[in-house]
Amino acid sequence: MCIRDRYEALKTLALKSAKDFLALYESIPDKNAAAAPERKTFYGKVPCTANEMYEHTKNVNTYYFAEIAVEADHDGNIYECRKRGFESLESNPDFLQNTVRKGSYGEDWSLRKVLRRFIWHDRIHAKAMYRMAIKVFGAENVVNPFYF
């Protein structure tokens, strides 16, 4: 499989993941309900409601793309902003070089890493959102596009 095909496959998964995350979020009857009390870690407040989980997951769009020097935003829904981020990325003729860049906190980042991270990050927060939602609303009232 050539580099472009691998990129397109991972991009397709990252966009599907964003669509699935949005579908899960939109299916939750009360986006401000929580199944557990608020708590904090050394990272800060843990997202407890569907709205908090959604906003957190959507808003990393700018962070992940910035780690590979791509201008992006988190305006609109998670799918729309991620799609625009890929469009911005693809406007650079050398985007498939998979250049490794030193990102914030001294961490190495590449296009492949960003693609994998989108999928991983969506999944961990979708699982938390789904678990919270079925506790509060029941599995029959929430979609499960990730097949948890």
Describe each region flagged by the PLM.
Residues 31-79, 104-148:
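Short, contiguous alpha-helical
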Residues 6-27, 73-104, 109-128:
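Acidic/histidine-rich alpha-helical segments that form the ligand environment
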Residues 1-3:
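Short, small-residue-biased leader/transition segments that mark boundaries at the very start
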